Regions:
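Conserved catalytic core of the tyrosine transesterase superfamily
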Residues: 1-238
């Protein structure tokens, strides 16, 4: 994997601190373990963009903080940049990689254990509304996306191959948000079963959900796990 060469490079030429070097080495070893165990890949030139996206999704699925995920992505980008310059590989699979947005942590009154229990227990009905509500809570909690981004998601914005969603952020800027395997599975089941074709979350007339309705949905479920009176989608962005 040329890891030793890379470590020597950042140590002697880049003169990174011992702490930074250790972090890089740890991140890369974790990635190598993932691709070897999951895909039996032992050569960096065999790594694809999709494979890296799967790795990132697995990190997010294990509730790793977005700041930690971003650091690991940075380590991988530096590693592949070195491989390209050193002519060890011909292509760089990290070029189109976008780091997940770093968002605020959950407020103390929305404990992680409580959120986990919300998904584990039968709080959501086995109906269109129940499945829709669960997806809304999932997307807010696991991606940190904004309310305006969520209500504007269309089925065409969901990249099932790379496990990511394209959203329109502030000032009409597009960004790609990685999603976990479980969330992608729930999305696929919801879209296919209810034959969703345009807006992911829509009213009966096909128009996107109103912001106030999303607020009511979030408040309904947070009331089951929190005693705080004022609750909103922002409380789920961690």
């Amino acid at each position: 994997m040329y890891l030793e060469d890379f470590i020597n490079y950042i140590k002697s030429e880049k003169r990174f601190s011992n702490h930074t070097i250790t972090s890089y080495e740890t991140d890369l070893n974790q990635f190598f373990n993932f691709i070897q165990l999951e895909y039996q890949i032992t050569k960096p030139q065999d790594v694809s963009f999709k494979l890296i996206r799967n790795w990132i999704s697995s990190l997010l699925e294990n509730n790793l903080k977005s700041t930690s995920v971003n650091r690991k992505i940075s380590s991988l980008k530096s590693y592949y940049k070195f491989l390209i310059v050193s002519n060890y590989v011909d292509t760089n699979p990290t070029l189109k990689l976008i780091s997940p947005k770093s968002s605020k942590r959950l407020p103390v009154f929305v404990e992680k254990d409580n959120m986990d229990s919300l998904f584990d227990k039968d709080f959501f009905e086995d109906s269109y509304e129940g499945k829709r509500d669960k997806l809304i809570i999932e997307l807010f909690y696991f991606t940190g996306m904004r309310l305006s981004e969520l209500i504007n998601i269309k089925t065409s914005n969901i990249d099932k191959v790379n496990s990511q969603i394209k959203v329109i952020g502030k000032r009409n800027k597009e960004r790609l948000i990685p999603i976990t395997f479980n969330t992608l599975k729930d999305l696929n089941e919801f879209i296919n079963f209810y034959e969703i074709e345009n807006f992911l979350f829509a009213e009966g007339n096909g128009k996107k959900l109103y912001s106030k309705k999303v607020y009511r949905i979030v408040n309904k479920y947070l009331a089951k796990i929190s005693s705080i009176k004022k609750k909103s989608p922002h409380d789920l962005r961690h």
